[in-house]
């Protein structure tokens, strides 16, 4: 039976706690209590760069190694099939394409694996957190599709953040990070993501499925 949203949320937090070595109560109530101090002023300070799908396609065209990072936004948009089409098209152009799978991306453990299996993505290119993190060091483009907390660098260094200590995907180590989100709203943990304002990050706003369909057309035309 499919777990309820509330049950899977608690299970997800338990997994987060394991990685963070913190109590469940600390994470649940810590996120609520810290939201204003961690997220309140950050957005004003961040230098958000909004790009079009045409510009994103040009960046991907120049790349040789691309890592796709699926998240909850991909699931909501049911964009897994077009994500695979984009990956297949890039691979046909001679590029190396991998998928970075965080254990708690989405709304339940294994959510991304299930979605990508539905789209017949080869298991060989699905890499878990420990396996993929060293790959970001020489990655030309990390393409973030609706993932948020699991790519927030604050988890590594900001002790005031409710997600501090949570293992994350080190996408910020890539040369360029293309982030697709519907809006600037915070993720599951309720904190703003400092990655969005990094010098090597660009935002492509919109529904993941619509954005990827546009991106696919642009890539094919280049």
Predicted regions located by residue number:
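Conformationally flexible catalytic loops at phosphate/diphosphate-handling active centers
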Residues: 20-48
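Single conserved hydrophobic/aromatic residue that forms the stacking wall/gate
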Residues: 1-7, 11
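Alpha-helical transmembrane segments of polytopic integral membrane proteins
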Residues: 13-17
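Structured cytosolic domains appended to multi-pass membrane proteins
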Residues: 44-222
């Amino acid at each position: 039976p499919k777990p309820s949203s509330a049950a899977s949320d608690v299970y997800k937090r338990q997994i987060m706690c394991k990685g963070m070595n913190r109590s469940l109560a600390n994470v649940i109530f810590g996120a609520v209590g810290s939201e204003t101090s961690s997220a309140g002023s950050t957005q004003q300070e961040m230098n958000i760069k909004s790009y079009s799908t045409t510009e994103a396609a040009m960046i991907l065209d120049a790349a040789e190694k691309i890592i796709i990072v699926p998240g909850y936004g991909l699931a909501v948009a049911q964009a897994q099939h077009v994500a695979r089409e984009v990956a297949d098209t890039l691979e046909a152009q001679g590029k190396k394409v991998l998928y970075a799978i965080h254990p708690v991306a989405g709304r339940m453990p294994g959510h991304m694996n299930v979605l990508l299996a539905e789209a017949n993505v080869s298991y060989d290119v699905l890499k878990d957190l420990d396996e993929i993190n060293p790959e970001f060091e020489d990655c030309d483009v990390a393409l973030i599709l609706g993932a948020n907390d699991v790519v927030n660098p604050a988890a590594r260094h900001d002790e005031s953040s409710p997600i501090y200590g949570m293992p994350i995907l080190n996408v910020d180590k890539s040369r360029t990070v293309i982030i697709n989100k519907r809006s600037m709203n915070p993720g599951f943990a309720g904190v703003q993501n400092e990655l969005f304002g990094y010098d090597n990050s660009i935002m492509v706003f919109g529904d993941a499925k619509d954005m990827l369909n546009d991106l696919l057309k642009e890539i094919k035309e280049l």
